[in-house]
A protein has these predicted regions:
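C-terminal non-catalytic interaction/localization modules
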Residues: 1-29, 59, 63, 109-112, ...
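Amphipathic alpha-helical interface elements that mediate macromolecular binding in regulatory proteins
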Residues: 10-14, 35, 46-49, 62-70, ...
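Switch I (effector-binding) loop of TRAFAC-class P-loop GTPase G-domains
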Residues: 17-46, 56
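Core residues of folded domains in eukaryotic genome-function proteins
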Residues: 33-35, 44-47, 76-79, 110-113, ...
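Short acidic, Gly/Ser-rich segments with clustered Asp/Glu that frequently serve as metal-coordination loops
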Residues: 52-59
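Conserved C-terminal guanine-recognition region of P-loop GTPase G domains, centered on the G4
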Residues: 69-146
Length: 223
């Protein structure tokens, strides 16, 4: 389960399992490491993997990606849930970058096993939320590229029933190999040069160049 800090990943796990894992507030995540939560759903043994949020106040997105990639190197998944707050009135550039990074992490071959789950439907009126969902579905820099390759968009209303329905969606699927797993394990690539790592590195390099240019301009002004 991936997504930005405060999207509701841990709350979702609590809804499914009936546990009471600590939940952070919107600006600070309680999940600082990979956390596996095991439970039974009917006769099936299920493992939900809680991950630190992108946009965390204490970790960079590159650090979060490194933690996730390290865990994925030895794990085959049945599916991936990416959570997004429908209450967000706009999508910032860093968040759009993370959508692109997430797409590259998964690759396009197994996106039928990816669910984009929108949360916080109780925090905004339905008409506004429905309009935002349509924007997320149709935006070329949002989720449209993944949906075009058979990813699914689902709603989570914060209830245990809906959370369990979302988990059940994945229980009929086989395990898969993600693009980043293939690149790290089979192709022996280092994380920064994988397709997912390159998305984050490109933005970091551009930020660094802007900082250097700004520093040079300030130095000229001081002289």
């Amino acid at each position: 389960i991936m997504g930005s800090t405060g999207a509701g990943k841990t709350s979702f796990i609590n809804n499914v399992t009936g546990q009471t894992l600590p939940v952070g507030h919107e600006l600070d995540s309680c999940t600082k490491d990979i956390r596996e939560v095991r439970f039974k759903r009917g006769k099936r043994n299920v493992v939900l993997v809680d991950t630190p949020g992108f946009g965390d106040s204490s970790m960079s997105d590159a650090e979060v990606l490194r933690l996730i990639a390290k865990h994925l190197a030895g794990t085959k998944l049945t599916g991936i849930i990416y959570m997004h707050r429908i209450s967000d009135s706009k999508v910032e550039g860093g968040t759009r970058r993370n959508y692109k990074m997430f797409h590259q992490l998964c690759g396009s071959d197994h996106l039928q096993q990816v669910a984009i789950v929108t949360t916080w439907w109780d925090k905004v009126d339905f008409i506004t939320a429905d309009s935002r969902e349509k924007t997320l579905k149709t935006g070329e820099t949002l989720f449209k590229p993944m949906l075009d390759h058979n990813a699914t968009m689902m709603r989570h209303d914060g209830t245990p029933t809906r959370a369990k329905d979302i988990v059940d969606h994945f229980l009929r699927l086989e395990r898969m190999v993600l693009k980043i797993q293939s690149q790290l394990v089979l192709d022996k690539m280092s994380l920064p040069v994988t397709d997912a790592g390159s998305v984050i590195n490109t933005d970091l390099l551009n930020d660094a160049r802007r900082c250097v240019d700004r520093l040079a301009a300030v130095q000229d002004e001081l002289r």
